[in-house]
């Protein structure tokens, strides 16, 4: 949690594409929830972050049922807040995993 929080806070000072990569990288070392969250949260305001969040959400829905978390993360990264294609009520949407 400490590592992920530091990456998330650091990503805000980086460019959109770099922050999404950094956050995604830290997310892969944790649970599937963190992976889905990392995609959208890392993009903070960037189109790339939104794409990663949506893509991860769709992919994880086939194996871990995390589509709502991934979609929410992508929309948050794109500046649209909660409420993605999966409902936007996953534990990562407004939880501590994104440092929000």
Curated annotation (Swiss-Prot):
Q: Which domain of life is it from?
A: Eukaryota
Which Pfam family, giving just one, matches this sequence?
Coiled
Comp. bias (Gly residues): 71-93
Q: Got any disulfides in this one, which pairs?
A: none
Q: According to the UniProt entry, where is the signal peptide?
A: none
- Region feature Disordered, mapped onto this chain: 1-29, 67-100
Any GO BP? sorocarp development
Q: What does the sequence similarity comment in the record state about its family?
A: Belongs to the hssA/B family.
Protein name, please? HssA/B-like protein 37
Organism expressing this protein natively:
Dictyostelium discoideum
């Amino acid at each position: 949690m400490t590592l992920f929080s530091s990456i998330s806070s650091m990503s805000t000072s980086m460019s959109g594409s770099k922050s999404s990569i950094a956050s995604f990288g830290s997310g892969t070392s944790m649970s599937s929830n963190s992976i889905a969250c990392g995609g959208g949260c890392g993009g903070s305001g960037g189109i790339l972050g939104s794409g990663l969040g949506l893509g991860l959400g769709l992919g994880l829905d086939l194996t871990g049922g995390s589509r709502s978390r991934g979609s929410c993360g992508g929309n948050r990264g794109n500046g649209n807040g909660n409420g993605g294609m999966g409902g936007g009520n996953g534990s990562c949407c407004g939880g501590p995993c994104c440092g929000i």
